[in-house]
Amino acid sequence: MAMVVSVWRDPQEDVAGGPPSGPNPAAQPAREQQQAASAAPHTPQTPSQPGPPSTPGTAGDKGSQNSGQSQQHIECVVCGDKSSGKHYGQFTCEGCKSFFKRSVRRNLTYTCRANRNCPIDQHHRNQCQYCRLKKCLKVGMRREAVQRGRMPPTQPNPGQYALTNGDPLNGHCYLSGYISLLLRAEPYPTSRYGSQCMQPNNIMGIENICELAARLLFSAVEWARNIPFFPDLQITDQVSLLRLTWSELFVLNAAQCSMPLHVAPLLAAAGLHASPMSADRVVAFMDHIRIFQEQVEKLKALHVDSAEYSCIKAIVLFTSDACGLSDAAHIESLQEKSQCALEEYVRSQYPNQPSRFGKLLLRLPSLRTVSSSVIEQLFFVRLVGKTPIETLIRDMLLSGSSFNWPYMSIQ
């Protein structure tokens, strides 16, 4: 399809220029009335009430107001969401702006699983990255406008990131404040997960495994309840987000505390030794354990620090993929805020590792390869029996710190 590109004209130029020069059409009826009055017989008249003063610029002012109102409701040319301004040559929303910037900066290549003609709107823009980038380019967003390594061009809104008065992170006060609150929300510092947790070569007993698993899950939920923006969401959205992401947060917490994952005690904790199981099921189950171990080891190999873990968990938590969200676009914007915080933190703290940010993000999709049902079977069947973890998550959100686990007595 051929695309016609015309020279863009700023709507503000028409507003600033005022009404076009030439005869004022509003003055024509006034001259006709004066001529008619002079031709008519003169009769005494009582003084009339003065009318509103003549304002030659009224028509122009009204046009300016209408133009200003239309400026405030400009749609994103990519997905139709409300535009936040002109980015990379076109009016786009924050989501499409950030997506285009990430794609160009990291020179990402996407693949369409359909016919390369997927609908891109507010509700489907996250389903196909290939078609989304294709539309960004089709509507005229310019690759050359994305400057490598550039700081975000716009200033944050008041209160958007001004969360604490902590020390600035290389001058980025709003980022350091956001990350500081993510870190402060951790209910259990690494040192309080248990002394055995930090000894990977130490084989933990069944009771210790169950205790640690309870801490990791409780920590994920309690952390989410105390981070910025999450408590402001509707409780139904909070439950939906945690129901979808609890297993990913659990894996991240397991990697952060270097949780020992030896096969024998894990199988014992899952109760596989007590119930007969076919050889095929045992092999499949052990394969799931291997996947879990691989994800934890790959994260540990990157030597992810506490601030990075907090940002990564926020990126995982704020996902618009959860079902039934009341405002998926808002959730997506929170994910992008967290991703920007991680990107700037890595750039400032690890300047000699230019690929570090990309490596961290590449670990996120594979977190979902760890089956949540396997995590339940491995760590929680002895703890809660057949009670679904989603039910426990809802109860933890509603009851908060007063929620009691059977294995939460050790401090």
Swiss-Prot record:
Keywords, ordered alphabetically: DNA-binding, Metal-binding, Nucleus, Receptor, Transcription, Transcription regulation, Zinc, Zinc-finger
All residue ranges annotated as the NR LBD domain in the record: 174-400
Residue spans binding DNA: 73-148
Transcription regulation in keyword set: yes
Subcellular location: Nucleus
Residues spanning the signal sequence: none
S-S pairs: none
Sequence ranges of Low complexity compositional bias: 24-46
Keyword Transcription regulation appears in the UniProt entry: yes
Region (Disordered): 1-68
Protein family according to the UniProt entry: Belongs to the nuclear hormone receptor family. NR2 subfamily.
Function field: Putative transcription factor that is required in photoreceptor cells precursors during eye development.
PANTHER family named in the record: NUCLEAR HORMONE RECEPTOR (PTHR24083)
Protein's name according to its UniProt entry: Nuclear receptor subfamily 2 group F member 1-A
Organism: Danio rerio (Zebrafish)
Gene: nr2f1a
